[in-house]
């Protein structure tokens, strides 16, 4: 049992779903407000007579919910499989909404809320706090469902850049987990968070563990996600050859389904990025064009394309790409870099204007705050400083680069 008194939980859910206040139910049943409140909190168990009165008001039957309980258990099992195999799980929200009136009378209703919570977390929806609080108030900390809850709570914390909290939650989830597939998912999420914390070797170890489990159970899309993350670790460590090999291996293994085409586009973009870091801008440009066929108008691909054309001194083509993608000026993720690249293209290979230098500093400093500053950000800034003859600032940023 996940509560001392599941009937109280069922009464509360049905009452709220039907839009009744406690006072309204009290007046309709003749049961005092205080006693109803105790029923819902689970501090007092209602008699059969009281349950019957409440059922009549809410127009429900709590006596026979076994079929619905089992249906919800089956739905949760199916949902967990969809996560493990990286299937589209958005349809669960529509399914839940169309069956909520049936589900809400079940003592397993918290599992429905958990499915909704995870789908919303994965979709990066902001409004999940209410769901999170409701689940936390009803789920038992010894249950395997609690492991799933704190795992995706950690995923949400990671998206908010609360890395320490995310790590702590995942360590707790690892202790509770007793299923190999669950372990694989936790390893995967732990590897991603460790990567964000720049703990690259720990991230690598966890991703390798996760990949082993995904391969064992034929979850090749998840396995590919591990390869992408491992490739990113190689990039961070400056092992561009290993990164390209890892990405290329996975690219060859992918099929032509919609999900795998999206993954191919990501791989092409990542390979383009590696070639940019290796200063092979022609090779990078070819890879970007392949990515564009699969996923046009991607912000990163657009920026990579502008940069490659700029470095190849094809300013006319670069400017055309800028004109065709003015929407990035309004995108908070890409805006500052898009403006910087626009300035660079307008300056061509001549002495950079002050606005270009200021924008390069702005981009670099912002990325530094977010812990995203990388080789290219330094390269752009240092190139501009060299052309501007800003000796003092050049030395300052070169010292920072040496430390990084």
Q: Where on the chain are the PLM-derived regions?
A:
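Short alpha-helical DNA-recognition segment
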Residues: 19-38
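Residue register of alpha-helical TPR repeats
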Residues: 111, 148, 185, 225, ...
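A short, Lys/Arg-rich alpha-helix, primarily the initiator
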Residues: 1-17
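DNA major-groove recognition helix of helix-turn-helix/homeodomain DNA-binding modules
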Residues: 47-64
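Structural motif corresponding to the intra-repeat A-B loop/turn of tetratricopeptide repeats
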Residues: 18, 122-123, 160, 190, ...
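Amphipathic alpha-helical segments of tetratricopeptide repeats
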Residues: 96-101, 133-139, 171-176, 208-219, ...
């Amino acid at each position: 049992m996940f509560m001392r008194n599941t009937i109280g939980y069922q009464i509360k859910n049905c009452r709220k779903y039907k839009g009744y206040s406690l006072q309204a139910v009290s007046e309709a049943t003749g049961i005092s407000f205080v006693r109803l409140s105790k029923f819902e909190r689970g501090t007092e168990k209602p008699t059969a007579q009281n349950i019957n009165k409440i059922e009549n008001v809410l127009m429900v039957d709590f006596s026979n919910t076994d079929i619905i309980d089992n249906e919800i258990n089956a739905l949760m099992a199916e949902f967990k499989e969809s996560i493990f195999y990286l299937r589209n799980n958005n349809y669960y929200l529509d399914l839940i909404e169309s069956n909520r009136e049936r589900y809400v009378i079940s003592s397993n209703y918290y599992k429905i809320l958990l499915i909704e919570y995870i789908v919303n977390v994965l979709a990066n929806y902001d409004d999940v706090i209410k769901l999170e609080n409701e689940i936390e108030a009803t789920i038992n900390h010894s249950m395997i469902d609690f492991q799933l809850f704190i795992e995706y709570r950690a995923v949400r914390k990671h998206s908010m850049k609360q890395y320490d909290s995310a790590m702590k939650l995942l360590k707790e989830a690892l202790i509770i987990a007793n299923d190999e597939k669950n372990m694989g998912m936790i390893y995967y999420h732990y590897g991603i968070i460790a990567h964000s914390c720049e703990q690259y070797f720990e991230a690598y170890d966890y991703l390798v563990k996760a990949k082993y489990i995904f391969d064992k159970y034929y979850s090749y899309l998840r396995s590919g996600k591990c390869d992408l993350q491992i490739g990113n670790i190689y990039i961070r460590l400056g092992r561009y050859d290993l990164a390209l090999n890892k990405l290329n291996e996975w690219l060859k293994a992918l099929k032509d389904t919609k999900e795998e085409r999206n993954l191919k586009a990501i791989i092409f973009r990542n390979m383009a990025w590696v070639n940019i870091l290796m200063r092979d801008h022609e090779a990078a440009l070819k890879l970007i064009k392949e990515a564009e066929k699969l996923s046009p108008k991607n912000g990163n691909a657009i920026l990579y394309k502008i940069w490659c054309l700029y470095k190849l001194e094809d300013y006319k083509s670069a400017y055309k790409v800028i004109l065709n993608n003015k929407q990035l000026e309004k995108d908070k993720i890409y805006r500052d870099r898009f403006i910087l690249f626009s300035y660079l293209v307008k300056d061509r290979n001549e002495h950079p204007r002050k606005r270009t230098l200021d924008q390069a500093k702005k981009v670099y400093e912002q990325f530094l705050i977010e812990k995203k500053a990388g080789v290219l950000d330094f390269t752009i800034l240092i190139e501009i400083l060299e052309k501007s003859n800003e000796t003092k600032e050049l030395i300052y940023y070169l010292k920072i680069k040496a430390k990084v």
